[in-house]
Amino acid sequence: KGGFRVPLYPVTPLVAIALNLFLAVYQYNFDARSWYITAGWIMAGLVIYFLYFEKGVEAEMPQVIGISQPKPAVEYPHRILIPLHNPENVVPLMQLASPLAGKFGGEIIVLGVIDVPQNLPIREGLRFKQYKMPLLKRAVQFGRDNSVPTRTALRVAHRVYDGILAAAAEEEASLILMGWKGYTTKRDRIFGEVTDRVVRHAPCDLITIKLADECSFERILIPTAGGPHADLAAEYAAVFQKALGSKITCCYVVKKDHTRRDVETAHEWMEKTIRESGLDESVERLILEADNVAAAIVQAGSGYDLTLMGASNEGIFSNVLFGEIPEKVARYSWQPVMIVKRYEGAVKSFVKKVLG
């Protein structure tokens, strides 16, 4: 129950909103400069807050607490952060991360986040760190068995995604690799609250993968369409091809009423992808004829162990996480789907943070 009540709710706030709108319109007609000054003042306040005062607030009322772990003996240039929660995902996520760490001369950081209810002090979570360690130690053992540098990280947070994002920033992660259980039924979320937030605000490259009960990466389908995200996905596919012996198939979707030029363009895109990503010539080429691109990829992907694709390019103000086609493929495919998203830069990330 709230600590106070607003008289005549909701009439009072509605009247206040109406009066403020009237005042704003009247002020604009009286002197438009006041609008510009106000807008500039608000933007300056936001910039100053995020650059300076936010750190002071965080110090007084931390949203995330880091639990000290042994420092690495060697500083690696590439760090892969794997948030772990589901014990069934440990092996497949480590199988994917290990060759990437080996390729880029990096290490794997397995992260456990202890979530504390909002009505409890965040430091209460420190008492439960022993319950997270067995899961993390299992991943560390996998890394040790495969000669991949692996260490643990622990965070306590009121919200799991805050713990993941804070760890990624503090550890200067190059890549976040995380699994997800499937789509949520809530309309304002796509992959679930945690995954949605991490995808939107990740400070580095990101891979999210929908895993199945039994995971194998012997046959991988790569839809090619160009763009920075798809190019990065193809580079990762080349790593899996060499390290895991995966058989790769590049595909391109053309319309049913395609022209000869459309087919030539498809071959050009596939050859460009293979050449620039480092895939070898054993890659199969596949042209799909369909008017619905996502449905064609889902149908083709049913014969593969994994569909690996890059996110679509979206505008800076877009609410779409990966793009319409990748999200539909992830939603409707029964097979594992991996979506790769390259870091979009500080400016775009800042705008998305301000807009929420």
Model-inferred region functions:
Residues 2, 32-82, 131, 146-149, ...:
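Membrane-interfacial segments at transmembrane helix termini in multi-pass membrane proteins
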Residues 70-131, 135, 142, 150-153, ...:
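Small/aliphatic-rich secondary-structure junction motif
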Residues 270-272, 289-301:
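A short, acidic, amphipathic alpha-helical segment used as a generic capping/interface helix at domain edges
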Residues 124-207, 218-219:
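Cytosol-/stroma-facing membrane-proximal "stalk/adaptor" domains immediately downstream
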Residues 113, 155-162, 288-294:
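Charged docking surfaces used in two-component/phosphorelay signaling
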Residues 44-49, 53, 167-214, 301-356:
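Gly/Ser-rich helix-loop-strand patches that form or flank binding pockets
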Residues 25-39, 317, 321:
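Extracellular/periplasmic helix-loop-helix junctions in multi-pass membrane proteins
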